[in-house]
Swiss-Prot record:
Location(s) in or outside the cell: Membrane
Glycosylation-annotated residues: N34
Gene Ontology MF annotations: transferase activity, transferring alkyl or aryl (other than methyl) groups
Annotated Pfam families: UbiA (PF01040)
Full protein name: Polyprenyl transferase dpfgC
Keywords linked to the UniProt accession: Glycoprotein, Membrane, Transferase, Transmembrane, Transmembrane helix
EC number: 2.5.1.-
CDD domains on file: PT_UbiA_COQ2
Length: 330
């Protein structure tokens, strides 16, 4: 089956062929659970211990149900929270709104799945460290409620699904060029927290910032990629990627500071180590260029735009706080 786009009349983009990734995943889980249970002869034991007897000595695993297990996988990929997934789209006005929304949905899905896989990889590499940090000790791998084998299977499924969606979104054009850079960065990210990386003045925020800024490129390619080269797409997205790169360094430096006490005990590498006791000054220096860049003295109207963005930020902050209060009270 094919679908026609408004990008170029008469040209077809391969459809996903009726495949529904969620249905496929449910089928995989069903077959996996039943096959494993049959291999171990079923039995009266319930939960993970019924078909993973070797893990019965771990209470978190032995007591879990199938529903709990699936829930742990979702938590492992942070699907129960917001994710730092960044996508962007650009194109002339001759492109239909329906096509843009279609590509947007595919791009968000691909990025969300890949981000989830990256979370699993990070937690697998850091599982021993996470177990010693107050904020992260309850993560599934750190507390032992999910095995490393299960985590790797889950991660692989997410990567495969993300790759499949990306192929459809990009009409199978330059897929590896879009995927490999962010995949390599995702693999390297947790190792940026190690002591050796600090010696080399490599901080995990550099690597993470790249992985969050890069999706701007496949995002634009989803709309304009059929009419421009990969090099041109990258060139057009470069200013935006640079902005997101530095913004993410600021954002994640502030975020990771939550773990400063435990991280310093464990000698975990992070960008805030540069600042020492002057972390607030560092954060101000990081964010100031982005804010100042919004004002152009040659364009007086930019002052109004800056004021408007500040107002929108205030409204957004109020709504976010209200939502958090509501969710907390609920």
């Amino acid at each position: 089956m094919s679908r026609q786009t408004d990008m170029d009349p008469g040209t077809y983009v391969p459809d996903i062929g009726g495949l529904r990734f969620w249905d496929m995943w449910k089928e995989v889980v069903f077959v996996f659970v039943n096959d494993t249970k049959q291999k171990h002869g079923g039995g009266s034991e319930t939960g993970a211990g019924a078909f993973f007897p070797q893990y019965s000595k771990y209470p978190a695993m032995a007591a879990r149900s199938k529903t709990k297990f699936l829930g742990e996988l979702l938590i492992l990929s942070r699907f129960h929270k917001y994710n730092p997934v960044f996508t962007t789209f650009a194109g002339d006005r001759t492109i239909s709104t329906a096509f843009v929304f279609q590509q947007t949905a595919l791009c968000v899905l691909a990025a969300y799945l890949f981000c989830g896989a990256g979370m699993v990889w990070n937690d697998w590499i850091d599982r021993d460290i996470d177990a010693k940090v107050a904020r992260t000790k309850h993560r599934p791998l750190a507390m032992g409620s999910v095995t490393t084998t299960e985590a790797m299977v889950w991660m692989t499924l997410q990567v495969i699904m993300s790759w499949g969606v990306l192929r459809v979104m990009l009409d199978n054009k330059d897929v590896l060029k879009h995927l490999i850079p962010v995949m390599v960065a995702s693999v390297l990210y947790p190792f940026g927290k190690r002591y050796l990386a600090r010696k080399l003045m490599i901080y995990p925020q550099y690597i993470l910032a790249f992985t969050i800024a890069w999706p701007a490129i496949p995002g634009r390619a989803a709309i304009c990629g059929r009419h421009e080269s990969f090099t041109e797409t990258t060139r057009q997205c470069l200013p935006l990627c640079i902005m997101v790169f530095f913004w993410t360094i600021y954002l994640n430096t502030a975020y990771s500071y939550q773990d400063v006490v435990d991280d310093r005990k464990l000698k975990v590498n992070s960008f805030y180590n540069i600042a020492g006791n002057h972390i607030h000054v560092l954060l101000v220096l990081l964010v100031s260029p982005i804010i100042l860049a919004q004002f152009d003295p040659k364009q007086p109207a930019s002052g109004g735009t800056l004021h408007k963005s500040n107002f929108i930020l205030g409204v957004w902050t109020i709504l976010a706080c209200a939502a958090e209060v509501f969710l907390t009270s609920a």
